[in-house]
Amino acid sequence: MSVIKKDQTREQYDRSKIQGGILRACYKRPIPVEKIESLMDSIEGDIFDTADKEISSTRIGEIVMEHLKDLDAVAYVRFASVYR
């Protein structure tokens, strides 16, 4: 799957980029690693369910924020402040 970036360039989907953003947002929060892994799996499932061959980085960010909002308010705000 390809990700369409804001400058319209394309690159291969990379789970580690999303995971890095989530880990930074959850830094020093009382969230077990298992919960973060489960969150990643859910996010990835949504990404692959909503897109065929391409998805915009903006849409990926929206999906991540939807999931983080339910997990932890502080992590959500951290991610949103960097993402926007």
Task: Name these PLM-found stretches.
Residues 1-78:
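Extended interfacial segments that mediate partner engagement and assembly in macromolecular machines
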Residues 81:
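C-terminal binding/interaction regions
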